[in-house]
Amino acid sequence: IEDKLQDGVPECISSLRKGGIKVWVLTGDKVDTAINIGYACQVISPDMKVIQLTSNAKGISLEVDKDGIPTQMCLNAVLAKALAEGEKAVKDGLEVVAVLDTYFLTSIEMYGKGQDLLKLANMCKSFIAARVSPDQKGQIVTLVRNNSPDTVVTLAIGDGANDVNMIQK
């Protein structure tokens, strides 16, 4: 079974991004699927710097606990590298997209690194979280809403029961 994008979705998202609106995708899909969808709907463009914080990312040496969650030391190193890459890309005039998976999001929550995640997200034009649970979707929306200036407006849109928690936040 293949999910197809509805007509006009890529153009709509492209217009939102051109208008300065950051688009976040929070999905239960696998990382590769989420990235492919990101390209298909223009959340990611070919000229963007993709910063991937996922358990299968190239160039990331993971030290994980028994549940596959990155350890605090590993998380600190990966976040520091991601922040440095993001800053360099922005300085070089590139747009940035961050791609995270459930394991990194769990580690960020466990070790209280939400502010670092927001710092990275603020550099990004787009943000993709893959393999996330309904609870994690809600936590991400809450994190952004609770730590953004009053001038920031957030909108959560979903098409299934797994999106209810996020939408209610």
Please describe what each predicted stretch is.
Residues 1-151, 155-157, 164:
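Cytosolic catalytic headpieces and adjacent flexible linkers of membrane translocases
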